[in-house]
Structures are given as C-alpha cells and as structure tokens.
C-alpha cells in the first residue's frame, strides 16, 4: 500500500469514520435523540468533521452557525439520524436530508452545498455514500470521459448520477481492490485536484 496515499488521503477519513462509530453509532445516537440532546449530536457531528479537511472553512462556519440554535440543532439531529440510520429508500432519505439542510438557519453563507449535504453520510457510511465536491469531481469526470451532469442545488437525481460515476470507477479499479467510497473519492480527488501534479 502506498504510504503517501494512506497519509494524505485515506487515514484521516478512516479516522473520522472511526470517531463517528465511537461517538454517534446507532445506539449512542438514539440515546441522545431520546434525551433531546440535539445540540450534543450536532456538536459531535461537527467536531468529527472538523478534524478533516473535507469541507471548506466557510462551509464549516456556516454549518456551526446553522446548528447553534436549539431548533437548528434539533432539525439537524433528526435529519442526520434519518439519513444515516433511517428506514426506506436511499432516494427518499437523501431528499429529506436536503430539505432539512435547506431549512437550517443561515447567518452569512448558505448551508445547502454539495459538500455539506454529502460529508456526513460519507463519514458515517463510507461503503454507501460518496463525498461530492463538485469542482474537483467534475474535473475528474471530464478527465475520465464521463458526462457528469452538474446542478448546483443538491438533489437525489444529481447525487444518483454521482453514485453511478463512483460505481463505474469502482468497477474499473477492481484489480486495485477499492475498499469503499473513501478509496473511490480519494482516487477521483487525486485525478481532479490541482494539489497533485500530473
């Protein structure tokens, strides 16, 4: 295994997933929900994400502002639980999550962005959810020859297209044995990001 890949791309994402499993696993999440500890749920989720470089600092601030109120934290906590642990079709859960994020209080910067909408599913369920940063992912898709359609407002229809692209990449990389969406997202990040030279 490439040590640079592990250090620069995979390890901190796996660490965030492990933190999620320790701090917001299903049982712990339910205990906090039943006790109406919405602010604690939001605090833990934001803290777990803050140890990564996944979302931009202005998005981190917008998210913290949005869950600062009890109402914002309650909506966030219930919506996040539904996304990660709820029953039903992924399509319905994702659309409800987008509606929740759209309803969160906005102080300065909008909260309804692709990175914010996809980061927590990715951290909690990296075998299922893809973390979508539109600019880098679109560059990677273009380089890959995949027609990734982009719509700025998050929706299941657009996310499904991103998941289809991730599934194609996973199949194409099957000889490398990608473990989860962390490997797929990291591969596409390296392809599309200016951080990595050709």
Where are these regions (language model features)?
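Contiguous, well-ordered alpha-helical segments that form the cores/surfaces of helical PPI scaffolds
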Residues: 117-125
